[in-house]
Every structure is written in C-alpha cells, then in structure tokens.
Amino acid sequence: MARTTIRSEDITAGQVKSADLASDAVDTAELANDAVTVAKMNDSAYLANRNYIINGNFDIWQRGTSFTGANDWTADRWLIHANGTSPSTTQQTFTPGQTDVPNFPKYYLRYNAGTSPVDVGEVNQNVEDVGVLGGKEITFSIWAKAASGTPDLGLLIYQNFGSGGSANNIVMSDNSLWTLSTSWQKFTHTVTIDSITGKTVGASSYTHFRIKMAHDAINKDISQVQVEVSPTATPFEHKTYGQELAACQRYYEKGAMHWRTSPSITWGGNYYAYNTASFKVTKRAAPTIVLSNEYTTDGYSDYNTADITTDEFALNVDSDSSGVSAGWWISTDWTAEAEL
C-alpha cells in the first residue's frame, strides 16, 4: 500500500514556504502533544527585552568603580546596603577569553560586607511599575561565587505600591537560598509574583529584588543577573552598551554645561546668566540635580537650578554687586538622578 504520511525526510530544505500553506492549514489540532513546549522554545529563539533587570551584566558604571559607603549607588541601577565596618563594592574585570561565565561578559560586581557586620549585606534593584510583574511567574537567575568557604546567598522580593498606595507586600524572603563555592555557578529561582488585583497603586511603584549576602568579610562576586517572565531560566540576554546605557540614563545621567557671556556687553550691578541643559534620555520623573566643579572667569557668585522637567533643566548664575565683564566663561558639571 502506498504511504500517505509525509515525514520530514520527504521534504527538502526550502521546499515548503509559508506562501504554500493555505490559511489555517496548520492549527493546534495538527500539532502532536508536546511538539511545541517552553523548553523547546528556550532551546531555540529568545524573546527580546525579556530581562527586567537593567544593567544585569554590570557594563555601566557612571558613578565610579569603587565604593566604600554603607548605602551607595554603585554600578548603575544597583544600590548597596551594608552594615559592617569598612564595606566595599568594586568593579572587577573578567579575564579575556574566560569561559566560566558564558558569553564573555566584561565586568562583574564584587561585594564585601566588611568586618563585624550585624546582618546580611544587600545588593538591590527596583523594577519600575509594580504592575509589570504582578501576577506573573518569573525566574530569577544569577551567576555568583565566593573568594573562600561556602557562604550563603539569598533573595528577597517585595512589591512597593508607590506613593499613597497599598502597603508593601513581601513575595518571598530566604537568606540562604543558595550556597556559594569558589567557582562560578548559575543559580535560579522561580516564583509567582502576587497579583495586584484589589491593590491601590500610587506614583513610583516597583517590584524590589534584593540579593542577600552572608554577613562575613568574604569577597562575593555576582554577574549576569536576570529576571524574566518564564517558568525556567534562559541564557542571559545580551544588550549593546548603548542600549544598556540609555536604559540606565532614564534614572541617572551625568553631564556638563559650558557657555560664554556676550563678548561685547559689560554688565554692571547684579546680573544673572541663564542657560538650559537637555537630557540625553527622558527621565522617569523630574530628577534631583546636583552641581559640582562650578567655575567662572568673572564675578559670578551663585549657581541655582530652575525649571527642572523630565527632559531638561535651567541654570541661573548670579553675579555679585560689582557686575561682570564681557565674554567670560561659565561652566559646571551636573548629575540628574531619578532613581526609584
């Protein structure tokens, strides 16, 4: 009897194209059970922008590369809470060509709680908008190791419902979810974030992720942190430096202003020079502006920010009572922070 079933070996590459298939020719009834599964999809193609953690690869360090404070913003979007004596957080560089952590990351974060810490150290990030992950099954993944011993690594997740919103809701908290070794390992944890149904959500809400470090003076290294809506962990999502920087600049940006007063007009008495700075990326909210390294070549005495929006701010520079000469330079560095 002639065979009527067509097997894959009967079809050459490119022989059947989408244009050859009638509408609805292939639907779920024609697919065998488990022909398409999450695991199989994870083994093939990955969705873009699936990682809700910003700067999980620790590529962006706008504020510097070494920190010793107890409550410091360190690598972009990462806030450290430490309670020991002389804690430290530093940027470390992978050996070129290493294969312990896949996809050739360049940097990782090293944390040390310092001496005599009284509680776990914390490496924190807030994912903007509590509704984004509410009610979803997510998988948290991280690569980590310790300089010595087998210290614990934990995870806390809670929902913050913003200004005037419902009270914080702890999704999970475990100080010893994983055990580190002196070799890089990938750790994962899957959990369903609580639904926000019935909650009041105010401004600046977020889902908080806290990596909890054992309270000892051992160096602990972390890399490639990812949070995705998935029942399993997929390989870390790589983004270009420019993509990651732009995402970080929604919350923090640094820049400078330099300008010159009129080259032909001398001003007497009190006078102010006015200029504006535009942000490269629209901020999450109107940011806090901090000025530094203010400089002028004439009698300006007071720098004041004004008209701060999510896209720009203005700077008024007041002169002293003696006035200013023509054509003098004014400059300042600035930072704009709109972190959660």
Feature map (PLM): residue ranges:
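Extracellular and organelle-lumenal recognition/adhesion modules and their flexible linkers in secreted
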Residues: 34-340
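Short, low-complexity N-terminal tether/leader segments at secretion or assembly junctions of large
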Residues: 1-43, 223-236
